[in-house]
A protein has these predicted regions:
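Inhibitory N-terminal propeptides of secreted protease zymogens
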Residues: 21-114, 151, 158
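Surface-exposed intrinsically disordered loops and tails
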Residues: 122-133, 189-207, 277-284, 316-320, ...
Length: 470
């Protein structure tokens, strides 16, 4: 997702928003950590035959590696630091079914923009339509008929949890404060953990250094002080699987999905994809483990919403690659719509339901469409305060004051609109019924494009009020 940062002058303050970064000696720099994170050949996924051996961690340590995570419910682990010889030794060990190199997942980088001014002191999450910048910037919420749903009392429930698998969440900014369940949140990105411990040692490991996750989370659920989300009461679980550079490992992402299912998430949002796809002929192991993990999530009663991808690929004609996560079982795969005219942060926006030119499509895989934005109209949120930009090999923090907003376009932004609606459907119709919730979602869309299911919109563009009025 392409993002732009804008200055936002706020008339009220938030605790902990003015923490200044420090760079102690003897700790990894952001650039060094990013290089380590991108070294995909040094990360491996280990599949077990049956249950995890009790001595697995010590065995990996003896071989010179480290266990980064274990997903016992599905029978795999992620390790790093093993040499080729050590990997070969581990493959021959009792109880090990397979060991193979992990692969990298990537989202688009961020870009900077210009300034606006605002006052959030009179806003309230009880009325999302009164959010400070809803009238002037959030064409996306209007496009999915969210204001009418809010007016009818559909605000979501704190008893429903949406897991955001992403770069983290700025968990105590205006729009997130109190919504994020830190006790059930976690990080699968050791490189980011090291940066946070060095620069912002009092922050939770899910603090967002990349900006992407906070924008995504806001579309699903928000306090609606500055920007409204589809829901204003849904709880959020932050699961960091992407570092500040926007990259992470497939193994870490799958482990994050297992974590979400094991810790009571009702719906999970995955606004990310495998760089270049996965070649089915040569990477069949990955397809197998992806299927196992998504089947596990379904068995735990969790709905999984995934972004279609931003490569303008027709997935119907690309039978060689496992595209993003849209081919995984049980998922809701979301394409993007966006305006065809207007100024990105000013409007007026024309034809907001047009298929976005970057969105991956495919009659077989696309379930529904939702606003993702375009060069003419962005999807926006508060910028994560500890968002890192590296300038001349040194970290800078353009959003540190808490007075910035972020705008972007991509299927990363469209997916969380659906996640917020799914959370509301679960609040209304009950938990643990992912197939029923998917049916209700599909039954409540506006059928755009060719009648029935088509490659661009799937079954149609979501309509929040219509889906919640069944």
């Amino acid at each position: 997702m392409r993002l732009k940062v804008l200055t936002l002058t706020l008339a009220v303050t938030v605790s902990a928003c003015s923490e200044d970064p420090v760079q102690p000696t003897g700790v990894p720099s952001p650039t060094a950590s990013a290089a380590a994170q991108s070294a995909g050949a040094n990360r491996s996924i280990v599949e077990f035959n049956g249950q995890l051996r009790k001595d697995f961690r010590s065995q990996v340590a003896a071989l010179g590696g480290r266990v980064d995570f274990v997903a016992e419910g599905v029978g795999f682990a992620g390790v790093s630091g093993l040499s080729a010889t050590a990997v070969a030794t581990l493959r021959r060990s009792p109880g090990i079914a397979a060991v193979y190199d992990d692969i990298t997942v990537q989202v688009d980088a961020v870009r900077r923009g210009s300034a606006v001014a605002a006052d959030v002191s009179a806003m309230s999450p009880a009325n999302p339509a009164a959010a400070l910048l809803f009238p002037s910037l959030q064409w996306n919420m209007v496009a999915v008929n969210a204001p009418a749903a809010w007016a009818a009392g559909n605000l979501g429930s704190p008893n429903v949890t949406a897991a955001i698998l992403d770069s983290g969440i700025d968990y105590d900014n205006f729009d997130m404060n109190g919504l994020v369940d830190l006790a059930r949140s976690t990080s699968f990105v050791p490189s980011d953990d090291a940066i946070l411990a060095a620069l912002f040692p009092t922050r939770n490991p899910i603090d967002d250094l990349g900006g992407h996750g906070t924008l995504v989370a806001t579309q699903a659920s928000s306090n609606a002080l500055v920007f409204a989300g589809v829901s204003s009461r849904t709880r959020l679980m932050g699961i960091k699987v992407l570092g500040f550079t926007g990259s992470g490992s497939l193994g870490g992402i799958l482990a994050g999905l297992v974590w979400a299912a094991d810790h009571g998430a009702d719906v999970a949002n995955m606004s990310l994809g495998v760089t270049g796809g996965v070649d089915k002929a040569h990477e069949g192991l990955f397809v197998g483990i992806v299927n196992r993990v998504f089947n596990y999530a379904q068995s735990k009663g969790m709905v999984v919403v995934v972004a279609a991808g931003n490569d303008a690929i027709d997935m119907d004609g690309d039978g060689r690659n496992f595209s993003a996560f849209c081919e995984a079982p049980h998922v809701i795969c979301v394409s993007a719509t966006g305006p065809t005219s207007g100024m990105p942060f000013q409007g007026p926006w024309g034809n907001v339901d047009a298929p976005a030119d970057y969105s991956d499509i495919g009659r077989q895989n696309i379930t529904v469409a939702a606003p993702g934005g375009s060069n003419f109209g962005f999807v926006s949120a508060l910028c994560a305060r500890h968002f890192i930009q590296v300038v001349n090999n040194a970290p800078t923090f353009p959003c540190i004051s808490g007075t910035f907003i972020l705008g972007g376009a991509g299927t990363s932004a469209s997916a969380p609109h659906v996640t917020g609606l799914v959370a509301q459907l679960i609040a209304k119709y009950g938990k643990g019924r992912p197939s029923q919730i998917k049916h209700l979602l599909i039954n409540g869309v506006d059928d755009l494009g060719a009648p029935g299911k088509d490659p661009f919109y799937g079954y149609g563009r979501i309509n929040v009020l219509k889906a919640l009025s069944q």
